[in-house]
A protein has these predicted regions:
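Fungal extracellular serine/threonine-rich, low-complexity, intrinsically disordered "mucin-like" regions
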Residues: 1-99
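Carbohydrate-active catalytic/glycan-binding domains of CAZyme proteins
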Residues: 96-414
């Protein structure tokens, strides 16, 4: 049994303690007690502080504890009998979470191109990916670019080694429809038990789906605003309103967007009202046009810390990412790795597995295994799916042959 559809890799066993202070162990029913646990766990322990004893013949793995956010604290452990193997595993996981932090500089390795436009499709580039790992597979949503404009595609695979041979489902075949749709973000909105795909269509749009594995199930576009907000129109000039990004905390859902003119905007609505009621956008961060260009991501990295990533255009004309942190989504952003000489990700701090196939590290997304609206990621061993481009490519922007590659952090602090 799984208590929530997001718990796609349920635990195989579980232990609970009842009011009689005895342990109850069940190995025949698979239960996940965390609705966003996608990492397999071999055993789960739930501890009532009033209990005094628990025994088990097997240990709880650190990965299980990490994925379900359960740990045996020293205070609780001192008052109950817990197998040493369980305490050791719990301590290891708790310590890893407590000490895990983002470094102040980043180093990466990169794959070669993993996903490119299908030959004969008429599409020139695959861009702007969003990715989650769910139900034993990676699910990628991306923009398709060609001379006539943009739409979106869905691709799924179980291993990055198979990404290049995965089938494409073009989302203009779904109720999302034809026309301008681009730069998707996907997440599971747990309060409504629905997947959301947020994207741009000249406005800030979204579609929903009860089943991420059914690409035909996405609803027709709806928008967060009836028209472009006045603050955006006034700020962007002749540039575009692009790259919508939603993240929620316990109280509010926030919509970030860029104006390609050096300003990052934020608006919000109560979680209970989402997706309705988005307020007037305010400036969350600003800089010169190319120093704060587009393609923002915001993530929760634990301990009340949020990570912001925004794409910039360097002095060499190539794309790269800057980063900041904050103690709240609507708070002040403090530079982390936020300069061209100390970037979050740029060709200068990336080592390629083979040839350096791109000089631009552009619009992408962290690989997320926790798929809900909080966009929670571990600060350790980051992976980032990004768009890159052959430096020799020329032509109209829409026809450039962007492909997707994978960054893997090589200097994790935890």
């Amino acid at each position: 049994m799984s208590v929530d559809p997001v718990a796609t890799t349920p635990c195989t066993t579980f232990i609970t303690l009842n009011s009689t202070k005895t342990a109850s162990y069940n190995s025949s029913t698979a239960v996940s007690i965390d609705p966003i646990a996608t990492t397999p766990c071999t055993q789960v322990i739930t501890i009532n502080p009033s209990t005094s004893a628990v025994s088990s013949s097997a240990a709880v793995s650190p990965s299980a504890i990490s994925s379900t956010r359960i740990a045996v604290t020293s205070e609780v452990a001192s008052s109950i009998e817990v197998p040493s193997s369980v305490i050791a595993s719990s301590s290891a996981a708790s310590t890893a979470e407590a000490t895990g932090s983002l470094p102040t500089s980043f180093e990466w390795s990169s794959s070669g191109p993993l996903i490119s436009a299908e030959a004969g499709s008429g599409i020139d580039g695959i861009k702007d990916p969003s990715i989650v790992y769910y139900d034993g597979a990676y699910h990628v949503f991306a923009s398709t670019a060609q001379e006539s404009g943009y739409n979106m595609v869905y691709i799924t695979f179980t291993d990055f080694a198979d990404a290049g041979s995965a089938s494409f489902y073009y989302l203009d075949q779904s109720p999302i429809g034809t026309g301008y749709r681009a730069a998707p973000e996907v997440f599971y909105f747990e309060p409504q038990k629905l997947w959301y795909l947020v994207y741009q269509n000249g406005n800030a749009a979204y579609s929903t789906n009860a089943d991420i594995t059914d690409p035909s199930g996405w609803t027709a576009p709806k928008t967060f605003y009836s028209s472009e907000p006045a603050a955006i129109t006034a700020a962007r000039g002749s540039n575009a309103w692009v790259d919508m990004w939603v993240i929620c905390d316990t109280d509010s859902c926030y919509l970030f967007s860029s104006d390609d003119n050096g300003q990052l905007f934020r608006s919000s609505t109560p979680v209970a009202d989402f997706p309705s009621g988005m307020g007037e956008p305010v400036v969350a961060l600003e800089d010169s046009q190319y120093a704060l260009f587009e393609a923002s991501n915001v993530y929760s990295v634990g301990d009340g810390t949020y990570l912001l990533i925004v794409e910039a255009i360097g002095n060499d004309g190539n794309r790269y990412f800057r980063s900041w942190t904050s103690d709240s989504i609507d708070g002040t952003w403090t530079g982390l790795a936020d300069t061209e000489s100390n970037p979050f990700a740029k060709s200068t701090n990336v080592v390629f597995d083979s040839d350096a196939w791109t000089k631009s590290i552009s619009h992408g997304e962290m690989v997320r295994t926790q798929v809900d609206q909080t966009l929670s990621i571990s600060p350790c061993n980051l992976q980032y799916l990004y768009q890159g481009l052959d430096p020799a490519a020329t032509g109209d922007y829409n026809t450039l042959p962007w492909s997707l590659g994978l960054l893997t952090q090589t200097n994790s602090a935890c």
